[in-house]
């Protein structure tokens, strides 16, 4: 019983404790709810108050924006009204101006109609008077025909014939007088111009020279230039086409060749070889090639310097090169570049005296002998060849005609043509200017070389020993050793049948085979 009582007591205690705890828990939640409601009420009140403030601010901002937009709109309306007023004013002014112009036009039209009516009236009166005059004229003609016994046509023909005869007589007399006066005046003026031009020219005399002297420091250098068994000197002659003469002349070697360009290349190449000290066939070929390039550059520089000195502009580069090559050419012993410069200056002086184009005259004078400097031999006269070059490189028609006509091969169509012809004669015909011997000698050597070039397989040909020997270098692929002898015979036979020459001409055919490999 006691145990049951205890158990009941325990259960009752547990139940009572649980009830007390539940009561206490319920009482705390109630307080929390009350506090939450208070806080929510306070927050809601604050939110309503803040919302009212925001609402008032927004309403105030909206009112300010409305006032601003209203002001802008009113300003736009005012601006538009002002522009409309200005346009209306311009329209009214334009209408007033147009109205005035219409009034003027109406007045002018009325005046024109009045003048037209007046003109028509005068025209009618004039036509009436013209009819009356024609009637009177016919009446007078009829009376004259009756008196003279001639018809109108017969009288007119007699009068015309008489006037023609008288006019022809007077015209012939006047023409004859004018011709005589022109001849006298032209001769006097031409003499005056030519004398004035000649007096302003002074140049050197012609010099005939086919050799150059290469000075050396000692005779020991001669042996190095000759080389073992003469291989060096043969290599120089083969590379340059110049005959090297080594004789007893102390400290000097003679270079003989009719072509000044070849002589100059040989002289410069020898100078480089002796200065460098390395003289052997391979080095000789290398130096000659470089020297040839150097001479080509120098030719271009000489051409540019010449045209600048003469004040000639716009010349084609190829023509400038031809002008530079004139330095190494001569005509009858007269240096071609000096002659052309002289003719150019003379043409400029004479053109200035005659009131012609000085620049064109100097241009034609400088280029008149470019046909004497051909890249290859041509059958054309040098004047026509020069004219072809000038046309090819864009020179003016007057200049081309002056070049082609200065030896009368073509008709002179330009005023520059006779000027160039006269100035060429002044430069070449004065005492000491030219000598015939050198030019004919050089032409004979050129012809000798051209004979060799006419055969197949010939690479180059050089006339040496004053034309007594012709060295022909052939291509080993085209000419065999057996054919070399036959080629030499054929060339000698052609020279014998086609050319006139003193003494004998030795023909030497040189054939060389080279095998070159490179070790890498």
From Swiss-Prot:
One cellular-component annotation, GO: plasma membrane
Record flagged with keyword Nucleotide-binding: no
Coiled coil: none
Keywords: Cell membrane, Endonuclease, Hydrolase, Membrane, Nuclease, RNA-binding, Transmembrane, Transmembrane helix
Main subcellular localisation: membrane
Top EC class of this enzyme: hydrolase
SMART domains (UniProt xref): HDc (SM00471), KH (SM00322)
Transmembrane segments: 1-21
Pfam families reported in the protein's UniProt record: HD, KH_1, RNase_Y_N
Membrane topology: Single-pass membrane protein
Protein localization: Cell membrane
Domain KH, chain residue ranges per copy: 210-276
The protein's Enzyme Commission number: 3.1.-.-
Superkingdom field: Bacteria
Residues covered by the HD domain: 336-429
One biological process term in Gene Ontology: mRNA catabolic process
Keyword DNA repair set for record: no
GO molecular function annotations of the record: RNA binding; RNA endonuclease activity
Similarity section: Belongs to the RNase Y family.
Function: Endoribonuclease that initiates mRNA decay.
NCBIfam families: HDIG, RNase_Y
Name by which UniProt lists this protein: Ribonuclease Y
Species of the source: Flavobacterium psychrophilum (strain ATCC 49511 / DSM 21280 / CIP 103535 / JIP02/86)
């Amino acid at each position: 019983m006691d145990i049951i009582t205890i158990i009941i007591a325990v259960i009752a205690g547990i139940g009572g404790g649980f009830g007390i705890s539940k009561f206490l828990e319920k009482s705390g939640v109630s307080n929390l709810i009350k506090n939450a409601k208070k806080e929510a009420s306070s927050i809601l009140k604050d939110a309503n108050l803040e919302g009212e403030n925001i609402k008032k601010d927004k309403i105030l901002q909206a009112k300010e924006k409305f006032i601003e937009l209203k002001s802008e709109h009113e300003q736009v309306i005012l601006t538009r009204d002002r522009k409309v007023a200005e346009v209306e004013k311009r329209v009214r002014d334009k209408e007033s101006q147009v109205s005035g112009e219409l009034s003027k036009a109406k007045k002018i039209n009325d005046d024109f109609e009045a003048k037209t009516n007046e003109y028509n009236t005068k025209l009618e009166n004039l036509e009436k008077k013209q009819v009356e005059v024609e009637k009177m004229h016919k009446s007078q003609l009829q009376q004259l025909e009756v008196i003279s016994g001639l018809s109108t046509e017969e009288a007119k023909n007699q009068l015309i014939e008489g006037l023609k005869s008288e006019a022809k007589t007077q015209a012939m007399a006047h023409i004859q007088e004018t011709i005589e006066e022109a001849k006298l005046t032209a001769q006097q003026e031409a003499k005056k111009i030519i004398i004035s031009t000649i007096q302003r020219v002074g140049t050197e005399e012609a010099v005939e020279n086919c050799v150059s002297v290469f000075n050396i420091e000692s005779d020991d250098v001669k042996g190095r230039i000759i080389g073992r068994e003469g291989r060096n000197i043969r290599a120089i002659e083969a590379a340059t086409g110049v005959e090297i003469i080594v004789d007893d002349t102390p400290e000097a070697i003679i270079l003989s060749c009719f072509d000044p360009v070849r002589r100059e290349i040989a002289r410069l190449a020898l100078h480089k070889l002796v200065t460098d000290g390395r003289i052997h066939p391979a080095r000789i070929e290398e130096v000659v090639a470089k020297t040839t390039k150097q001479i080509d550059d120098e030719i271009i520089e000489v051409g540019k310097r010449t045209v600048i000195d003469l004040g000639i502009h716009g010349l084609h580069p190829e023509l400038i090169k031809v002008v530079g090559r004139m330095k190494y050419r001569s005509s009858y012993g007269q240096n071609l570049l000096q002659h052309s410069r002289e003719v150019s200056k003379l043409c400029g002086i004479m053109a200035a005296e005659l009131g012609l184009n000085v620049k064109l005259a100097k241009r034609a004078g400088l280029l008149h002998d470019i046909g004497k400097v051909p890249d290859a031999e041509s059958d054309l006269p040098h004047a026509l060849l020069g004219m072809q070059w000038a046309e090819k490189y864009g020179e003016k028609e007057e200049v081309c005609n002056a070049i082609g006509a200065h030896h009368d091969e073509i008709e002179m169509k330009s005023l520059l043509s006779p000027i160039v012809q006269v100035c060429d004669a002044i430069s070449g015909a004065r005492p000491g200017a030219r000598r015939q011997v050198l030019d004919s000698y050089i032409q004979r050597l050129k012809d000798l070389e051209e004979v060799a070039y006419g055969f197949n397989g010939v690479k180059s040909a050089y006339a040496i020993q004053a034309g007594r020997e012709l060295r022909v270098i052939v291509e080993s692929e085209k000419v065999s050793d057996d054919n070399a002898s036959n080629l030499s015979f054929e060339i000698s036979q052609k020279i014998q049948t086609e050319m006139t020459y003193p003494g004998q001409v030795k023909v030497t055919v040189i054939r060389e085979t080279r095998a070159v490999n490179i070790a890498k």
